Amino acid sequence: MTADSVLSIPPYKADDQDVVAELNSRFGAETFTVQSTCTDMPVLWVAREKLIEVLRFLRNLPRPYVMLYDLHGVDERLRTQRRGLPEADFSVFYHLLSIERNSDVMIKVALKEGDLKLPSATGIWPNANWYEREIWDMYGIHIEGHPHLTRILMPPTWEGHPLRKDYPARATEFDPYSLSAAKQDLEQEALRFKPEEWGMKRGGEHEDFMFLNLGPNHPSAHGAFRIILQLDGEEIVDCVPEIGYHHRGAEKMAERQSWHSFIPYTDRIDYLGGVMNNLPYVLAVEKLAGIKVPQRVDVIRVMMAEFFRILNHLLYLGTYIQDVGAMTPVFFTFTDRQRAYKVVEAITGFRLHPAWYRIGGVAHDLPRGWDALVKEFVEWMPKRLDEYEKAALQNSILRGRTMDVARYDTRQALEWGVTGAGLRATGLDFDLRKARPYSGYENFEFEVPLAHNGDAYDRCMVKLGEMRQSLRIIEQCRRNMPEGPYKADHPLTTPPPKERTLQHIETLITHFLQVSWGPVMPANESFQMIEATKGINSYYLTSDGSTMSYRTRIRTPSYAHLQQIPSVIRGSMVADLIAYLGSIDFVMADVDR
């Protein structure tokens, strides 16, 4: 697929039934069990024996489901609200995305505890590799035909599978941890890289290869991230990215927090994204609850999300330029970020992790004088972007280090699940704010920055263009902020509006229950994806009619982007890898969750 062939993306087709008709025509309606959900996409269960055939059919349709967007599992054993669904102890879902249809479909497979096996989908989508490893790691589901089925988020010596319902969720449920010298040696040895296990040779016919650890503590790794490089001189023959050092069990935590109290945890996924992290989560919960927020809430949410897009991109710009050797710009970008944080702190009361969005609204209304602060920032920032473009991005050394480096095309990007600026730098105009508007983005005028070479330089230039468009959106929010409440008038709005809480005993009781036990969400499944700072971020929520989520799946863009590294960087130099890593825009909290 080329970018030119899909530049005209059709309107978003939520719950697209065309693909259901195509599947029924090819395999027969009796092959599938259709599940009704709030996910805005067809959800179909299929027998394991038919799985690969169905997936391959969807991948090869005339308008194909070209991207394996997500792949994960659910422990179904304690789920009570399963009427009409196939009997299952565990289930695995495949979330597929079609650019040419602008629609999604989800295929599910039911598994019994004594027969936890699935065929690998890596022969259809190469990015299935890491997702299948994570299914094995978290649930113990064996993937037959996988090229190297090992743990990915947990240490290689770990015992058990953490997302199983019978696996403890709290540290106090374990024995006190101790690390003896012998155990430390064992753990260190387990991390020793053995090339033969990955199909690598220690040498060629006339040379020996060197194996070099880049990370897990390296300034260019942007976090606790290890890449084992197979080198012939300074040329990268192959490499193995190793993640998991920053894993905190965010999806497991979601099963022990109420729908309301999990909001602060979302801030820590992409810790540079601030309230941008809250948005897909609260939108997904609001789908479960049936809440429609006031227009003022939509505009406030959009404005603050775009502030954090700028904050993220400024840090990205400074560290990216620093990675290729220019030290000065990072100090300027960090100083400029303080201007944006001044506005964020005045409005939300916090800086890095406001946790400010609420189910049904935002924490409080905009303070007096907010518009003057926003106006000052929006008028000041464009000149700074002009300076960065002229002084840094037009610099001949930076251009020489990054142009035609780590280049990939649209087809490769889609095969590996790349989204955001990394995808748009290949020329594909796919931005969810335009293609699948949410939170009222359809009411704003802005452009989607594109490039066409798909290299490290283009990815940076797309990010610069996105900051300019974010300023346009913020200014429209300032000029057109509607009047009205900052929370929805709905029983599941959490917490309920303060004015009513102070005046009505029934609302006070509701407030007490919602912030202590948590609101009770109807049993169903919901899904929301957004155009986040680093690509597409989404929450897939399963409610069993309780105060807590039965299953929270967090799909982050950085996870997919790091899996692509070996396919892009083979044959390049180590210095090119540094430029490539800087151009991706990732943080390991977003990868490891």
Curated annotation (Swiss-Prot):
GO molecular function terms attached to this record: NAD binding; NADH dehydrogenase (ubiquinone) activity; NADH:ubiquinone reductase (non-electrogenic) activity; quinone binding
E.C. numbers: 7.1.1.-
Enzyme class: translocase
Subcellular location: Cell inner membrane
InterPro entries the record matches: NADH_DH_suC, NADH_DH_suCD, NADH_Q_OxRdtase_suD, NADH_quin_OxRdtase_su_C/D-like, NADH_UbQ_OxRdtase_30kDa_su, NADH_UbQ_OxRdtase_49kDa_CS, NDH1_su_D/H, NiFe-Hase_large
Xref: PROSITE patterns: COMPLEX1_49K (PS00535)
Reaction catalyzed: a quinone + NADH + 5 H(+)(in) = a quinol + NAD(+) + 4 H(+)(out)
NADH dehydrogenase I subunit C: annotated segments: 1-184
Its job: NDH-1 shuttles electrons from NADH, via FMN and iron-sulfur (Fe-S) centers, to quinones in the respiratory chain. The immediate electron acceptor for the enzyme in this species is believed to be ubiquinone. Couples the redox reaction to proton translocation (for every two electrons transferred, four hydrogen ions are translocated across the cytoplasmic membrane), and thus conserves the redox energy in a proton gradient.
HAMAP family associated with the record: NDH1_NuoC, NDH1_NuoCD_1, NDH1_NuoD
Protein name: NADH-quinone oxidoreductase subunit C/D
